[in-house]
Design a protein with these regions (language model features):
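Conserved alpha/beta core of the MobA/IspD/sugar-nucleotide pyrophosphorylase nucleotidyltransferase superfamily
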Residues: 2, 151, 155-207
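Hydrophobic packing residues within well-ordered alpha-helices of enzyme cores
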Residues: 17, 58-62, 116, 153, ...
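Hydrophobic residues at beta-strand termini and immediately following loops
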Residues: 26, 71-73, 133, 176-178, ...
Length: 207
């Protein structure tokens, strides 16, 4: 069995939201904890949580989880790429592959991770290096990258994340389908926040 870790990107500035969305309370927990909990429930190790301006709050809200490694990205204002590079650097040589999670997607269930891992085990030997969930025909996160691609993250810049790597290696990508589009829901705007509150009771026990 390959060793698979996780990077959870939690250093965003929430410019479109106007407030730190990852600390918003949902079901008695800050929003980012749902991605963390999904990664831990799936047995991913190591798990790296990359934070920025609100790093101390991230530490406080994960103090019960010894397995979480928190990395401070002091260059968080430059965009997502700097956080992703910091996470990859922390996991180089320690994992065979890594999931890249967005910290504002609270509805991704562990079954998504399980199915992607099963696909990785089955198809890596056939040359597939990127595995992505496809929620009701829309590609989403978390994305699983094989360690063979880690060096390429050194070239990414700004807010692109891993997009350029996905495009470059699209022929080596496998999309794993899921019917539920809400599993891939993320929060960027106040309108998204309203939708979040509307659909959350279906997935999260409210407190």
């Amino acid at each position: 069995m390959k060793k698979v870790g996780a990077i959870i990107l939690a250093a965003g500035m929430s410019k479109r939201m106007g407030k730190p969305k990852l600390l918003l309370s949902l079901g008695g927990k800050p929003l980012f904890r749902y991605s963390v909990n999904t990664a831990t429930a799936a047995g991913l190790k190591p798990i790296v949580l990359v934070g920025g301006k609100h790093i101390e709050e991230l530490r406080k809200h994960t103090s019960d989880l010894r397995e979480i490694e928190i990395i401070e990205n002091r260059d968080y204002e430059s965009g997502m790429a700097s956080s992703l590079k910091a996470g990859i650097q922390a996991l180089k040589g320690r994992t065979d592959a890594v999931f890249v999670f967005l910290a504002d997607q609270p509805f991704v269930p562990p079954i998504v991770i399980t199915k992607l891992l099963e696909s990785y085990d089955q198809y890596r030997k056939e040359g597939v290096r990127i595995f992505r969930p496809k929620y009701n025909n829309v590609l989403g996160h978390p994305v699983l990258f094989d360690a063979e691609l880690f060096d390429e993250f050194e070239q990414i810049q700004g807010d692109e994340g891993g997009k350029s790597i996905v495009q470059k290696h699209y022929s080596s990508l496998m999309a794993v389908p899921f019917e539920n589009s809400e599993w891939g829901f993320d929060i960027d705007t106040t309108e998204d926040l309203l939708k979040l509150k509307r659909i959350a009771p279906k997935y999260i026990k409210q407190k």
